[in-house]
Structure formats: C-alpha cells, structure tokens
Amino acid sequence: LVIDLEPRELGYYHVPTYMADQSGDLTFQVPLRSLLAIDSWVHIFIADVVFGLFSRGARFEKQLNEDLLFKLRILGKALYEGRQILECSELVQIGRNCIIDPHAIIHGPTTIGDNVTINAGAVIENCIIGNNVNVSQDVQLMLSVVGDGAFLPFKTGLFMTTVMENSMIAQNTCLQMCVVGRNTFIGAGSTFTDYNLVPAPIRAVDGHGNLSYANRPVIGSAVGHNCRLGSGLIVYPARTIESDVVLAASKERRVIDKNVRYEDSDHHKFKFPGLHKRLYPPKREESQELESW
C-alpha cells in the first residue's frame, strides 16, 4: 500500500547556519494528507504541530492559490468585518460564550472552543484552543494546541507546544516544541530549552523506552500526566519527565539534564508523600512488542 501524502517543504524559522543546514532554514516536510503511527511523545508533537497545524496552514494556502471564489469570500468577509484578512471570522473560528478582549491579537487559521476567556495583550497565531480555557494578559501562543480546561496565566509563552486538558502553565514560563500531559502543573519562571549548545545530535525516548535520535536540530521536552513542577526549573532539550512526578527546584536539582522517572520524584522525600497519588503507573505487565509502521 503506497499513499501519497503530498508533502511540501515549509520553513518556520530562518536562523543562523549553526542551528540548521547551510541554508539557515528550519523546515518540516508538511503533508497535505496525514498518516502517522504514534509510539512516543515526539510523534504526538509531530501529529499536533506538523501533521495538524502546519498541514492546516498548507491546505489553506493551497486553496487560496487555486480557488478564486475562496479568496474572494475571505476578502469580502474581512472587508465586511473591518478586520485584517488573518483576523476575519473565516479564519478565526470562535465558539460560544467566549470573552475576548478587543486588545488581544488572534491570527488564523485558529480554532477557539466554547467558554474561553482571552485577556488583553494576548497574541495567538495558528492555534487550536479547547473549551473552558483561560488565556491571561500578554500570553504568547504560536502553532500550539491547548486542551480543555487549561489555564495560562500572564506572560506564559507556548511555541509549537501541546498542552493537554486541565493543565496549568504558570506565568513567565516558556515552552518550545514540548508536550505536556493532562492534569499537570508547571510553575512560574520555568524554561524548557530546545537547542543543544554544542552540535551533538538530540536523542529522545522512543516507544520502547530507549534513547533514539530525534532527527531534529531543535526539539523541546515532554512532561507526563499528573505532574507537579515547581518554579524556576530549566529543562534541557528532549528530556522526559514521567507521569506523577513532583519536582521542586533546589540546590541539588534546578537544571533538569536527565530524564526523570517516578522513582526519582521529589515527593518521596516530603513529609507526607502519600498525599500525591500515583495515577498513571506504567503497564509493565504488557510485554508484547509495540506495533509500529
């Protein structure tokens, strides 16, 4: 079975050549049709950002170039609403009962769910935002997916990042190319880096729990479900923090330079460790091989 995904190369940053190839472009092969086996968190990143948001943008550009009526409809809607083309309701779809400050900037293609609050100074570009989400002042969202019930306090920054439902990314925290699980808290002033300062290949955990080359010059990290991360942490690229982990910045561990397992969680040293329940134990008894394409 051969499926033509109709890929096209799209750049998302022009950077110095030491961060990319000789052309200085960071690019993805973006398919117009999507088919992907998900074995690890890196595949979730690819599915949401590359096969999801980038592909939606590529399909929009293709239709805009080939369909004159579509182009005229968008232009007419923008003129009627008195908005820029990328801000018109044809490209920015907003659900019911939303409260959006007029000083927020939202560029499409963007989809916003029901009961969403977006405050002044927020900038949102090409994102998918679920229901019951709170986006506070000066939040920056670009090419990101935000799940239902998430809370983003002021000056949170997400770039090419997936945040699953009921999670909170506290103020002045920056996540780039990351995946965050459900019911997780990440404290204020934390930074998730995505680039090796020396040109060593980036490796991430694969579906079998082994370190494999990520085949990307830049990539962020993964935080599991039901995690509690304190303020002021710095996380190196491609690190994995398992579900149910609690991390508190300390003299011993403020910079996360290794993958963190549940057994390494800080809450085991707390006075009442039983107050943080383990909700997502690994299914180690299932020893069958992962099916993959």
Language-model segments: residues:
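Terminal amphipathic alpha-helical/low-complexity segments used for targeting or macromolecular assembly
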Residues: 1-85, 89-90, 238-239, 244, ...
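Short, flexible active-site loop motifs that bind/organize anionic cofactors or intermediates
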Residues: 34, 141, 175
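Residue-level signal for well-ordered alpha-helical positions
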Residues: 50-51, 147, 181
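Short, solvent-exposed loop/turn positions at domain surfaces
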Residues: 86-88, 106, 123, 174, ...
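Residue-level "contact hotspot" at macromolecular interaction interfaces
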Residues: 91-93, 111, 128, 145, ...
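Glycine-rich hexapeptide-repeat left-handed beta-helix
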Residues: 138, 152-293
